[in-house]
Amino acid sequence: MTTSAQILPLVKDPERLEARLSEIPPEPGVYFMRDGSDRIIYIGKSRKLRSRVRSYFREGYNKTERIATMAKLVTEIEFIVTDTEAEALALEANLIKQHQPYFNVLLKDDKKYPYVCITWSEDYPRIFITRKRQLGKEKDKYYGPYTDSGLLREILRISKRIFALRQRPQPLFKDRPCLNYDLGRCPGVCQQLISPEEYRKTVQKVAMVFQGRTQELIDILSEQMEKAAEALNFEVAARIRDQIAGLKSLTAEQKVSLPDDTVSRDAIALAGDAQHACIQLFQIRAGQLVGRLAFVAESHAEPGAILQRVLEEHYQTAESVEIPAEILVQHELPDAEILADVLTQLKGRKVTIFTPQRQVKAELIEMVERNAQYELQRMQKLGDRNHQATQDLAAILDLPNLPHRIEGYDISHIQGSNAVASQVVFIDGLPAKQNYRHYKIKNPTVTIGHSDDFASLAEVIQRRFRKYAEDPQLSRVGNPDWPDLIMIDGGKGQLSSVVTVLQEMNLLEDLRVISLAKRREEIFLPGESQPLKTDAEQPGVQLLRRLRDEAHRFAVSFHRQQRSDKLKRSRLDEIPGLGHHRQKQMLAHFRSVDYIRQATPSQIAEVPGIGPHLAQAIYDYFHPSHL
């Protein structure tokens, strides 16, 4: 078997690099950086493409470690020329959103701050709090990230009390609504007792709360209440009155003293150290603080450039009504006029961006900056603890470098049933939940009454690293997906099974793998019969313990979910041709599966949508001895 020659990075092929750079024009546009696997790893914009791209490869140019690493991986450069800088800015935002290049992740998605998600992609949208943005469904809308998860949950709780919303992701019963419907808390979504169109109107009202348009919603409801009262529809008027009272209670404590209370404005500021910048964005609508969002970025640029990138990423998914008329910034932005023009086009009205110098607006920026400083201090304390733990772990295991990415694996089952595995990831000592994975064990020898943790772990590791075994040329240096350390929950036996499979895949030399036994927190290394001599209270051991406990928690929760789904599954699901809608028709007619079992084919055929042929198939399913 032959393999294609590996493409050298451009930094190792000066002639090809210079030829490629000379092809790039000195015009505004967007550029792409690709690695040896043809993946887009970075997207940028510039008013002069050639000089900007050349700067990445210039000796002595002031580059951060992250950007220097990126430049070493680049094997191809592409570009798109635009007429104006504003067009380049808008195009860059769309392309970053589409491709999500690794080195473009300026805003760290460490799931520290929660979002509110509204699933507009569904007929009956759900509203829930999440710490992970799923980018696959463009119709779904995310609001946040919010700094105060407790306040966010309270707002959502009150919103669900004010408006009748679906309370469950899945129906509790197949043939009738649950108690929430009887209490007026849900309009009976599970039984489609409300049309999707009417329900979406209700959800849109809740969306206005998270868009900072609470006062606008109150005005709309007040007008509806007056019309209902004039029509002598006092029951509807009373319900709307209660909704207005609930909405006013949401904003009663959020008043901010500002001039021009009718003007919507955002205020953004940051506080940073050599590594990170903590950014706070306050959303003020009609004089009320309706949202306080937080971001974490790397401090590899000037403060104004960081603020601009945050604003670009924040507003690129915003609806026009969510863009404020004024944006107050702590530092001048490098391309403030261009960003203002882009936002003006999106909003359809004038948007201004400026740095306030005095009076109330300047005091507002100072308040936002103080909040950013408090968040930075909290983050530094946490970072010091984790840095100390990774240093200690590197010393314990004699690692050449601090372990940046550590992966932990665990197996969960009950006597072999519903066997699953977890893969959790810690980045610089912190859980990176966006990188978590779970696996359903496929090994046919793992069945009810017969568990095999060794074989299960071997299967999971093989599935995790299969692409690297199949393609030895796949880049590992600088690859964010490649772990610096693997920890297995278990003892010598579990570790041995993983070592064996990594040897078979020719990957053992490139991976450091250990196991952590629950008893006495013992660390085992490959080929060693005795555990390392460590103190259970050492920072490095405590880090491994946190990783092990998190892997166990994630595995157990997924196992419980699998068991719950299996228990909820109806016997009707096993009948070919009997979809969800027909199942609902059957249960509505017969009230239970037991009555369906007792019915004759002719009685089953009386159900709307069930013909004689399907009725016979249903009867035969419950009476196999009849065949």
Swiss-Prot record:
Subunit-level organization: Interacts with UvrB in an incision complex.
Transmembrane region(s): none
Family of this protein: Belongs to the UvrC family.
Function, in words: The UvrABC repair system catalyzes the recognition and processing of DNA lesions. UvrC both incises the 5' and 3' sides of the lesion. The N-terminal half is responsible for the 3' incision and the C-terminal half is responsible for the 5' incision.
A molecular-function term among this protein's GO annotations: excinuclease ABC activity
Subcellular location: Cytoplasm
Positions of the UVR domain: 215-250
Lineage, highest ranks first: Bacteria, Bacillati, Cyanobacteriota, Cyanophyceae, Nostocales
GIY-YIG domain boundaries: 26-105
PANTHER family: UVRABC SYSTEM PROTEIN C, UVRC/OXIDOREDUCTASE
Keywords: Cytoplasm, DNA damage, DNA excision, DNA repair, Excision nuclease, SOS response
Coiled coil location: none
Name this polypeptide is given: UvrABC system protein C
SUPFAM superfamilies: C-terminal UvrC-binding domain of UvrB, GIY-YIG endonuclease, RuvA domain 2-like
One of the GO BP terms on file: nucleotide-excision repair
Species this chain originates from: Nostoc sp. (strain PCC 7120 / SAG 25.82 / UTEX 2576)
